[in-house]
Amino acid sequence: MKRNIQIEALNQIPLEKQRIELVERKCLGHPDSIADGIAESISQALCREYLKEFGAVLHHNTDQGEVVAGESCPKFGGGKMIRPIYVLIDGRATKQFNGVTIPTDTVAVEAAHEYLHKILPELNLQRDVMIDSRLGTGSTDLRDVFKPRQGKVPRSNDTSFGVGHAPFSDVETIIRNTSEYIDTKLRKKYPAIGQDIKIMGLRDGNTITLTVACAIVDRYCADIREYQEYMGLLTEEIGKVAKKSTKRKVVVNLNTADDIKSKSVFLTVTGTSAEMGDDGSVGRGNRCNGLITPNRPMSMEATSGKNPINHIGKIYNLLSTQIAQESIKKVDGIEEMYVRLLSQIGKPIDQPLVASVQVLPRKGVTLQEINGEIQAIVDDNLANVTSITEKVIRGELKTF
């Protein structure tokens, strides 16, 4: 069946030429991102368990988790946790199939423990966190929609949509690169740099201002003087990363709420504000491209934790982003591209109600010149939509 792919030209000012642009990222140790990461790690673990036992992924959604802040007493040289962080795992998972009981709660708790150990090495998992799994079972009608049919494309679990865009702007690129640099390189040299980092980017004309909140781990920081040295180091390193991706002026402001005189600063025991006063929820942070982009169309769906078989809130957000990025790479003449995929509940996921593509051609290029190439890329990605499922299960696609 021919797919309903609609491609239209946009008539608007390109984002890079607009006066104001805002971009945000909540890094791995932010409470909202912790919730996202736990939810996704549980979904992946359930997928592996189902595949091992039954050769197929069974119905589940773990996209409703909460991180409830604990209480701590940080101090230079090393503080302590007073009350543990509470993690609530809820959602739905198939617990019995063909007479076999699946230990879904055990799988979920183990996955959460493993994920927290990986991203928050300063957190004592035996003492400083409580993990409570309250997974239920799904509604009968949605489980019926989910039922795999041999050789058939899965049917949409909902009437919903996914959104993606490309290419990334200077500010978007800077924030993604800064987060990756700190997580993969800088923290290895300086373990005092905590995992709870929030980066807010403002571009006002040709000036980019990065406002960064970064937790410092108290046991690796002796006093307020050393804390200030870390602030100077981070400001310098972030500035270096930023300037690799733009010719614009870059200003870095770090931990702007600090009061150095009274020593009231962003100091933590574990590297995350979830240890005291900051709760987290799945879906309240980054979109599947790792960013929050109010200048762009966005879906409000939580991508993390949703099943990767037929949950449109996951599949179409990932797929629309993939389509936009692939089109930018392969088709010359695209300034900006936005993709929106809309499903109908119960219909095959490779047949969206509409695949809407909005293109801002570069100067001197008409939509007619590039329409055919874009159409082919969209159609091919929809025909191979189940590849998204495989990539998600293997952990190859990020969801936040």
From Swiss-Prot:
Organism in which the protein naturally occurs: Methanoregula boonei (strain DSM 21154 / JCM 14090 / 6A8)
An individual GO BP term: S-adenosylmethionine biosynthetic process
Reported cofactor(s): Mg(2+)
GO MF annotations in UniProt: ATP binding; magnesium ion binding; methionine adenosyltransferase activity
Pathway linked to the protein: Amino-acid biosynthesis; S-adenosyl-L-methionine biosynthesis; S-adenosyl-L-methionine from L-methionine: step 1/1
Described function: Catalyzes the formation of S-adenosylmethionine from methionine and ATP.
Its EC number(s): 2.5.1.6
Alphabetized UniProt keyword annotations: ATP-binding, Magnesium, Nucleotide-binding, One-carbon metabolism, Transferase
The protein's name: S-adenosylmethionine synthase
Gene3D superfamilies the UniProt entry points to: 3.30.300.10, S-adenosylmethionine synthetase, C-terminal domain
One Pfam family per UniProt: AdoMet_Synthase
NCBIfam families: PRK04439.1-3, PRK04439.1-5
Superkingdom of origin organism: Archaea
Signal peptide positions on this chain: none
Catalytic activity: L-methionine + ATP + H2O = S-adenosyl-L-methionine + phosphate + diphosphate
Protein family (similarity comment): Belongs to the AdoMet synthase 2 family.
